[in-house]
Structures are given as C-alpha cells and as structure tokens.
C-alpha cells in the first residue's frame, strides 16, 4: 500500500507490504511473538484471492518509510511488525539508524506497468487485457467440441 494519488511510488512517504505468516513459524523465529499471534488485522482474508484458512495465521506488516536526516537528506527506514509487536526496526539497529536501510534511499521495489493507471504507480499488462478474451475463446472451443461430439453420434 502506498499513499493514494501518487504516480511514482518513490514519492510516497510510507509503503506497506502485508503477508500472512504461520503463527508457529512466527513464534519460532521471533520469540517476542509468543502470546501475540492471531488476527488483529481484518486484512488476512483479503490478501489472497483464494479462500484459505487464516485461523493459524497472522498478518505481518513490512513498513518502509522515509524521514529526513540531520542534513535534510531523505533516509529510508524499515519496520517489520505483527499485531503491535515490533519484530525489527532499522532505526533501532545501530548500524542503520543514521544512514538508513539503503544508501540510495529508495523503496526496494520497481513498478514497470505496460499500461499505467491514473494517479497510481501500478498498472496492467497484456495478460490483464486478454484474460477475459482468452476465457471466452476457451468456452467457445469447449462448446464447439461438445457440439461436434453430439453431431457425430450415430443415429
């Protein structure tokens, strides 16, 4: 998720990426998560198109944000948290607190849409454009196959 209305994701002051993680795996990697797993965010069932069981999963948020340093240069920081528990924060890391996550200060993703959407860094490509057409072609082929089979039966 980025700030609505920006056309370049690098212009957004915050960038959020959400993922579903298994609670047991979270507790084994991050001991501070013990007793804090569960569904505190309602987005878990909307992250994936498929209807998957989210009872033993938690939403983990990767938050990238830009803040000016003492000289006014924008520095990129990163915070990973789940259900209000901070799992990692670059501002708390002595090696990254001043210089940020990356020296270039840019978010770690690049959008390369074929057809851009208005007021958004996202877009779509030929697969998005042709998906419905291909579905119609497949249904038509199936109908012709069935019709051919029915017409070829001996009477």
Labelled PLM ranges:
Residues 1-155:
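Extended alpha-helical, oligomerization-prone segments that build pores/tubes and scaffolds
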């Amino acid at each position: 998720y980025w700030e609505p209305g920006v056309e370049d994701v690098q212009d957004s002051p915050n960038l959020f990426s959400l993922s579903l993680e298994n609670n047991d795996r979270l507790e084994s990697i991050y001991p501070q998560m013990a007793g804090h797993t569960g569904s505190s965010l309602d987005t878990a069932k909307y992250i994936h198109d498929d209807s998957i069981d989210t009872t033993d999963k938690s939403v983990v948020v990767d938050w990238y944000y830009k803040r000016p340093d003492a000289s006014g240069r924008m520095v990129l920081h990163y915070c990973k948290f789940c259900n209000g528990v901070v799992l990692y924060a670059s501002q708390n890391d002595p090696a990254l607190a001043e210089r940020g996550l990356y020296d270039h200060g840019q978010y770690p993703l690049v959008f390369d849409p074929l057809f851009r959407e208005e007021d958004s860094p996202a877009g779509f490509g030929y697969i998005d454009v042709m998906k419905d057409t291909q579905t119609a072609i497949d249904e038509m082929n199936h109908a012709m196959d069935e019709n051919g089979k029915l017409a070829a039966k001996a009477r």
